[in-house]
Swiss-Prot record:
This is Fusaric acid cluster transcription factor FUB10. Residues 50-92 are annotated as: Disordered. Its main location: nucleus. It is found in: Nucleus. Transcription factor that regulates the expression of the gene cluster that mediates the biosynthesis of fusaric acid, a mycotoxin with low to moderate toxicity to animals and humans, but with high phytotoxic properties. GO terms for molecular function: DNA-binding transcription factor activity, RNA polymerase II-specific; zinc ion binding. GO terms for cellular component: nucleus. PROSITE patterns: ZN2_CY6_FUNGAL_1, ZN2_CY6_FUNGAL_2. Fusaric acid is phytotoxic to plants such as cotton and banana. It has been shown to induce programmed cell death in plants. In addition to a mild toxicity to animals, fusaric acid exhibits acanthamoebicidal, antioomycete, and antimycobacterial activities. Residues 74-86 have a biased composition (Low complexity). Signal peptide: none annotated. It comes from Gibberella moniliformis (strain M3125 / FGSC 7600). GO terms for biological process: nitrogen catabolite activation of transcription from RNA polymerase II promoter.
Amino acid sequence: MAGDFSNRAPWKRSACDRCRAQKLRCHRDSGHSTDACLRCLKSGIECVTSKARPTGRPPSRQVQPTVVVEQGDTSSSSHTTDSSPSAGGTDMSNMMNFEYDLSLDNILDSIGMQHSDFMVNDNILVDISPLSSSQSTGQHSVTQAQVQAQTVDPSTIQSTASYQFNSLPSTSSMDSALPIRSDHVELLLSRLHSKLSAQLYSIRSSPWDIKGTLNLSLAHQGIGQDFENCESHPLVQVSQACTELERLLSGLRVPASAEHTPSSFSYTPAVPPRLRTTQLLIALSCYIQIVSIYGIIFSKVFDYLLSTSKTSNGSYQSSPLTLYIGGLPIPPNETLSGNLLVHLIEHQLHQIEQLMGLPEHYRVSSRAKDTKDGELGLFGSQHSQSLLNAAIQLGEDRDGNHDDIRCVRALKVVMRQIKDF
């Protein structure tokens, strides 16, 4: 029998452990009584052959009869059909009755190999089995996920919606080179507009520390310092809003290289996308709210400077702040911090006004004469200018004054007063 390992000839048995480890053919001599290979006999060591699985052709399976049920016109009867070669009488069944020995041992012997050579790579089957199990596990996990998605607790719907709103893609300095979807920018602008509206109402109705606005400090931790533990100041809040608005406007602004470098490596569409009316109006409203908040802050700061200058020993008088540049002290000046704050805010608003492309009478900062500042901004085109003028004219009174234009003018006046104080 081909599958019986004990009845095989000694010279056809499996290779010994030494030949199998070295992946060599194990030659055996039938004349010796000992069951040792020629290589072990020559070396004078004990030839050990581990028990291996039986090789050869597996025994044929017993053919089970199949039951065929036929339905007639009047009655149904069951016929038992034997699928054996003699019962069917088909030529396809008789073709399998060949007398050739197609066992694996004979094939391997004809090409100079043994079945034991493949036993070293039995771990390949072990490596393949986790792949199939992982696929079945993945299908099972998908089925469980579908069942869990169908049975959602209604109490978690509100929390899930708020998490999706809070996990919107933010525009930071790290991903500024990536394209931003216009609907995401519009939604982020709406959220920023809501924050600025709440801050504008709070700064008008609630008291805040005016003296802390003029305090200059040197932060050694850098930009990544966590300010959540300390009390939030209105100046810090509006400064963060300016930074966020500048990043959002950078995502909406069409790059200047889109028309001059069509064959660059970065993706630049041939036709730049048109801005929506809602995007332009929300961005303009955010800018006006920021200007209004800065106008309130600087008016309070100017009143504080007037009160401290009139009363030298007043309750608001603080010790002079000494600054050092290159190790040399700067003479103390009460209005130095106010002037530095004015220049800082002018530079911050200049970046936003440049991205928006506002005309001169809508700007707080001065526009450079030798540059084409604002021509590539959001309101730089003719259609955007028409929309800007139409939106401004809707709020004008009979005298041609407008609250938005008035807040821009008021901020410019109070900043000039602080500079000349």
